[in-house]
């Protein structure tokens, strides 16, 4: 017992040194960048270049620090109120692919978690089909002949997360004490929320529930496939799903060789997102190309349900009115709707928000539509949120990021893809169901 406690404390001390060293180097780097810009550089383009360079360095450091900080970086990419737009752009590219751990450990963890149910596995592939910061995925065949995949959590991950998140709390306390660094943000509360989210992500029972709920939403959709959870083979550290074979959506050559209709596939994904956001209020928050594939039948497959988002009932009920206000380009009405839905806190000066919304509506609704309109609007929103002392709900940021990410996927499939023009017929049907004139669109 004494040795294990000593080992834990020594490990925590070593991690603490590495993490604080990284923070110190970051602060020195930011001070140096500000000094260079203030006295030697004149243009905003040069400042942006410096920010991008520092953001790339920070992203690499997060990867070096390991699983917990990779996940922290991904969470920061959804917080435009905390970091500038140039940093968000870099952090959204943060990949958490890491070398796989040994197959011996994989079988050991599955045995420990499944107990006697382990005997239901007929064959378990030794080579993973995917390896990330939290887990790796192995294909398997059960005794009943069903093909499945096992998502297996990395060894000792909870212990490592506890150490790193404890240190992150200390850092948040220091930032909170310094007015120049805190920028009016409650870093201690942010660190606590971050801890809550990450520890929840380590519980694969939560992901199993998310996957089951998401699958239920699309059971009757002939264009969408979602893997089924194998409940008696899933635990806190092991998630078992049916294996859905498909061609990764980024493999355009193979998709074309199979004569798939890429334009239709892009539209199917776009409409699925409208259904997720408007009909169900529960959406896949990370639709990057690695999480999407096309089945042999040409159906869109979603993978990985660790990062999902919710839309409140209050917001869902107001979507029809918001669409009406947006269609009429009535920025004041739309901002009022956002306030009533609880998306903008009371007491906030809505003047800057109203001006930005007016510009966003003009850009979004005036033909010809920009092919990357969501990405452009997200950038405008992020700049406003960073510069003003208010915080948009994280799930709303996840919505913008998910739509922006899928917009990129759509353009990859079809260069003429435009999210606004595709969704217009769907929005017209919503307005009609809310007794509003679709002619306004």
Please provide the spans of the model-predicted regions.
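A short beta-turn/loop motif at secondary-structure boundaries
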Residues: 128-132, 230-234, 397
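Helix-rich C-lobe and terminal helical cap/extension of kinase-like folds
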Residues: 6, 46, 52, 235, ...
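ATP-dependent phospho-/nucleotidyl transfer catalytic cores
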Residues: 85, 92-99, 111, 158-163, ...
């Amino acid at each position: 017992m004494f040795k294990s406690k000593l080992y834990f404390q020594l490990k925590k001390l070593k991690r603490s040194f590495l993490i604080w060293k990284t923070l110190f180097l970051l602060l020195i780097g930011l001070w140096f960048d500000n000094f260079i810009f203030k006295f030697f550089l004149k243009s905003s383009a040069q400042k942006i270049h410096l920010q991008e360079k520092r953001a790339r360095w920070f992203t690499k450091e997060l990867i070096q620090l390991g699983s917990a900080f990779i996940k922290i970086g991904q969470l920061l990419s959804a917080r435009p109120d905390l970091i500038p737009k140039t940093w968000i752009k870099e952090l959204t590219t943060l990949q958490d692919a890491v070398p796989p751990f040994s197959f011996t450990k994989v079988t050991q963890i599955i045995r420990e978690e499944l107990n006697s149910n382990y005997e239901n596995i007929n064959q378990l592939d030794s080579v993973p089909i995917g390896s990330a910061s939290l887990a790796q995925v192995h294909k398997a065949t059960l005794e009943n002949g069903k093909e499945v995949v096992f998502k297996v959590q990395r060894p000792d991950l909870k212990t490592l997360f506890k150490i790193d998140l404890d240190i992150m709390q200390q850092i948040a306390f220091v930032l909170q004490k310094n007015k120049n660094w805190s920028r009016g943000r409650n870093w201690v509360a942010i660190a606590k929320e971050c801890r809550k989210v990450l520890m929840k992500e380590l519980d694969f029972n939560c992901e199993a529930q998310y996957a089951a709920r998401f699958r239920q939403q699309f059971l009757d959709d002939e264009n969408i496939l979602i893997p089924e959870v194998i409940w008696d083979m899933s635990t806190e550290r092991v998630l078992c799903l049916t294996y859905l074979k498909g061609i990764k959506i980024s493999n355009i050559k193979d998709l074309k060789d199979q004569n798939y209709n890429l334009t239709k596939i892009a539209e199917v994904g776009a409409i699925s997102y409208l259904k997720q956001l408007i009909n169900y209020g529960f959406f896949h928050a990370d639709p990057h190309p690695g999480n999407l594939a096309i089945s042999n039948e040409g159906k869109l497959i979603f993978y990985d349900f660790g990062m999902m988002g919710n839309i409140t009932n209050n917001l869902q009920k107001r979507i029809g009115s918001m669409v009406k206000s947006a269609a009429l380009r009535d920025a004041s009405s739309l901002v009022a709707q956002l306030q009533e839905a609880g998306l903008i806190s009371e007491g906030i000066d809505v003047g800057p928000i109203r001006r930005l919304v007016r510009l966003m509506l003009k850009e979004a609704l005036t033909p010809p539509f920009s092919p990357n309109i969501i990405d452009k609007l997200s950038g405008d929103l992020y700049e406003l949120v960073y510069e003003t002392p208010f915080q948009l709900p994280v799930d709303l940021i996840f919505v913008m990021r998910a739509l922006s990410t899928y917009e990129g996927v759509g353009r990859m499939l079809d260069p003429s893809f435009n999210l606004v023009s595709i969704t217009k017929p769907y929005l017209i049907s919503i307005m009609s169901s809310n007794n509003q004139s679709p002619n306004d669109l």
